[in-house]
């Protein structure tokens, strides 16, 4: 397995590029703010993207890449096995933020530092765009939050409750 990373464009990414992507997550607990304290609450569900959902996400990535977002892909051969997108819109009063819009690694490739590499590439892109920080609105599951914490993320000083800054 030789993984390579490159910016997504019309030559290496299209609506069908995620047809074999495995977006699966079994959630048992999620973080919730209860009376001002973060607590793990039992919330069980399973997420599985269908091919149609993968195509919808891919079409959205393709629409924005190179325009108002930068998209970076992780490839195993020619197959997209992970991707991350960063908005070009800088916002914020206390710091210059850009939003990490989408961040996914196909299930068979998790735990291999592919997500960490993609995340660091997104940080480099944010700096290139002139931002100080990435704004991340992440899944509240125990596992997702642990993954972000493991790569050095902390709770934001700036919180948007709605709508997304995009």
Residue spans for each PLM region:
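Extreme N-terminal starter segment of soluble prokaryotic enzymes
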Residues: 2-3
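Short polar catalytic/cofactor-binding loops
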Residues: 9-13
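Acetyl-CoA-dependent GNAT
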Residues: 20-96, 101, 106, 120
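Conserved acetyl-CoA-binding loop-helix of GNAT-fold acetyltransferases
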Residues: 111-124
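Conserved GNAT acetyl-CoA-binding A-motif
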Residues: 127-137
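Conserved active-site alpha-helix within GNAT-family acetyltransferase domains
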Residues: 140-158
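Conserved small/polar residues in nucleotide/adenosyl-binding loops
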Residues: 160-165
